[in-house]
Amino acid sequence: KMPCYSWDLQALDDCIGSKDTEGNLVPACKICYATEGFYVMPNAIKLRAYNKEDWKRPEFVDEFVYLLRDQVFFRWFSSGDIKWWKLAQKILEVMERTPHCKHWLPTRMLKPRFKKHVEIINKMAELPNVSVRFSSDSIDGTYTKEHGSTIIPYDDNRPGVKICRA
């Protein structure tokens, strides 16, 4: 839906924020769009498995910066999330080295229990070319103080709420 490329990991498997503190899948992740449709085609799964290993290479950041040289927008994680802190460091470096590109990062890793991730994601959010969105665990319109983005039922008409129908 966004007019840009994205870099993804496997939904649920590589989303440690998709589980609550007891290890149960949070409501929003129980209906995750990235667990059906084109996301479950063999080539799509193969690409996400490749990405899971590829980011560990020393050349990853330099090559990613090169690939984004002509891009205006980029989305991190239409599936998956920043599972590893070292990956977060590399993503931050890519963002810093591509000021011409607007990065969008939806994430569940801003939960207080992921302290190291929170610190580096907050650094990302300070960059003028980065938009970080804390993805809600809820599907009933409730959200915590950490963010203001959530999933709501279609029949919900709360005053002051902007609905994105993407």
Place the predicted regions along the sequence by residue.
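Class I S-adenosyl-L-methionine
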Residues: K1-A166
